[in-house]
Amino acid sequence: MQKLPAGRKRSYLMYTLTGLKLKNPTILAAGVLGTTGASLCRVAREGGAGAVVTKSIGPAPKTGHPNPSMIELDCGFLNAMGLPNPSYPGFLQELEFAKENSDAPVIASIFGGTPSEFAEVAEGLLPAKPDAFELNVSCPHAEGYGAAIGSNPCLVEAVTAAVKDVVNVPVWVKLTPNVADITCIGNAAESGGADAVVAINTVKGMAIDIESGYPVLGNRSGGLSGKAVKPVAVKCVYDLFTALEIPVIGVGGVSSWEDAVEMIMAGAAAVQVGSAVYDRVGIFSEIGKGIEAFLKRKGYSDIKKITGLAHEMV
């Protein structure tokens, strides 16, 4: 291991992802504490996240689905929020606040119904100078948006290319697991010019009240997140790491440093945390410290030494 100058502390976790400097490989996932600039800054400063992603913002104000829109299960959460948002003009001030006050990169999550709508939203948020954009082509419970686009490789490529044409910052594409072959969608994003893919969004799910017979969610069905989806996410990351040349950011069921290391060994360049933030905002620092201790104990000089390690175990 290379020796450092006296007084300088080795950083096991700091690295660059799609040109963005992260203090650690943990990122706040879209949709959790990303509604205001203040909450994004809190996650970055108090929580210790390496980067933060906003809630998904669209071309027009949207109220979302009726309540109940989120329920807790034994194995995670089931939600059908329906992409509620104030529109990009209504969110611009919050994004500007986050950019001015966050000590970590701020990524704007956006959605639309067509490639031109995605481009419109991206252009509309550019004055706030987000560090990157994350394209939500994977929400499973918003008709005409999200997975309705993300299950079509041609549309994914077109949406990605449309946004790349109007921005000069990295573009990440968040993928849905609710397809026959996620690598096909990942390849489409890469062909469109994506700088990274994010895998995965929630898995289609449903819960029914057996006393009444009614579906529990106001939208009847929704998306499952939390611990139950981690094996699905790990497999998707593993497959995408093999199929793509661009980085894969893992998300789905990460609630400990062990989960994060597993995702990284599958091929994730970084991990996003969503559902687990409801338990404690400081989980990002906890995961970062746990990964660093693991790297030291195992004798790895930095996190890149374990990225995709599972692929070498043949």
Curated annotation (Swiss-Prot):
Binding site for FMN: K55, S56, N136, K174, I200, G226, G252, G253, G274, S275
PROSITE patterns noted in UniProt: DHODEHASE_2
Domain of life: Archaea
Residues reported in the UniProt entry to bind substrate: K55, N79, A80, M81, G82, L83, N136, N201, T202
Keyword flag Cytoplasm: yes
Required co-factors: FMN
Compartments it resides in: Cytoplasm
Annotated EC: 1.3.1.14
Keyword list, A-Z: Cytoplasm, Flavoprotein, FMN, NAD, Oxidoreductase, Pyrimidine biosynthesis
UniProt name for this protein: Dihydroorotate dehydrogenase B (NAD(+)), catalytic subunit
Gene expressing this chain: pyrD
